[in-house]
């Protein structure tokens, strides 16, 4: 197939210029959230080192929840603040999330929705597949499977990158090196309730994505509603399949992501109620 006949060629050339990373952003953990969480743990009788570790993890949960919320609903920033606040409550009551898992999810979402305004590049791919390998090696084999699935889906949606098919195959190959000997794990009802709440509140976001006005950070172009909806669907698929297969440990790891989904859903609901009341008062 000639280059001019390749349906992927325009996307490949317009989004491949410069750098080896297209999805990452710096995150600052040295803020008030860390200090507050550290103080809370110290008051609970923990030593300084344990308290600081807890504080950093709590701050990470807040920031990753906020960042993931921006990928789920890039039009309504305050939903991320709500999700971040809920993630702190979850960290204090249920324990901290897993930063590696949250980072993996963040990159998967950004690859699918392209809110960065750039496709995934070699550095992003190495990072994603390495995390999938690492988690698979620890017995969580579903992560490389989901990584491969995400790559294949990305190759088929608007502006898809044809090499994603090969990367998907590589991710599936990594599954062969995963530890599949771990037995099935139980899932506590508290996580089932959180998953159900996230699903109910987040579902309207998929419809609202059709009218998104968000623009990519790098190219300044309106992001594809289809890609955003695919990313939202992937979020639900990942958020529910991983805990069902791998149990409480991975449910706790993904709790900040659920809080992000709940946060954007709550803000969308409040926004809709306010608009309905405003329209009613105008009549």
Q: What residues fall within each predicted segment?
A:
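N-terminal topogenic module of multi-pass integral membrane proteins
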Residues: 1-123, 230-283
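Generic multipass alpha-helical transmembrane bundles of integral membrane proteins
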Residues: 111-112, 117-241
């Amino acid at each position: 197939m000639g280059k001019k006949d390749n349906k992927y060629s325009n996307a490949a050339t317009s989004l491949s210029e410069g750098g080896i990373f297209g999805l990452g952003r710096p995150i600052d953990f040295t803020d008030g959230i860390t200090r507050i969480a550290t103080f809370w743990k110290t008051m609970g009788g923990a030593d300084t080192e344990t308290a600081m570790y807890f504080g950093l993890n709590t701050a990470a949960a807040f920031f990753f929840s906020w960042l993931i919320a921006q990928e789920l609903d890039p039009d309504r920033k305050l939903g991320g603040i709500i999700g971040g606040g809920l993630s702190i409550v979850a960290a204090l009551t249920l324990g901290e999330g897993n930063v590696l898992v949250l980072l993996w999810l963040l990159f998967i979402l950004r690859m699918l929705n392209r809110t960065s305004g750039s496709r995934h590049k070699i550095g992003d791919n190495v990072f994603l597949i390495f995390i999938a390998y690492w988690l698979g090696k620890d017995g969580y084999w579903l992560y490389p499977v989901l990584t491969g699935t995400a790559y294949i889906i990305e190759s088929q949606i608007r502006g898809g990158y044809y090499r994603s098919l090969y990367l998907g195959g590589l991710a599936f190959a990594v599954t062969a090196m995963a530890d599949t000997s771990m037995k099935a794990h139980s899932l506590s009802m508290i996580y089932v309730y959180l998953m159900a709440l996230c699903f109910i509140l987040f579902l309207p976001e998929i419809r609202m994505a059709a009218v998104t006005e968000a623009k990519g950070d790098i190219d300044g172009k309106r992001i594809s509603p289809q890609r955003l909806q695919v990313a939202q669907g992937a979020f639900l698929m990942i958020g529910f399949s991983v805990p069902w297969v791998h149990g409480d440990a991975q449910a706790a790891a993904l709790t900040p992501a659920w809080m992000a989904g709940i946060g954007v859903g709550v803000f969308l609901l409040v926004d809709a109620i306010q608009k309905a009341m405003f329209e009613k008062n105008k009549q």
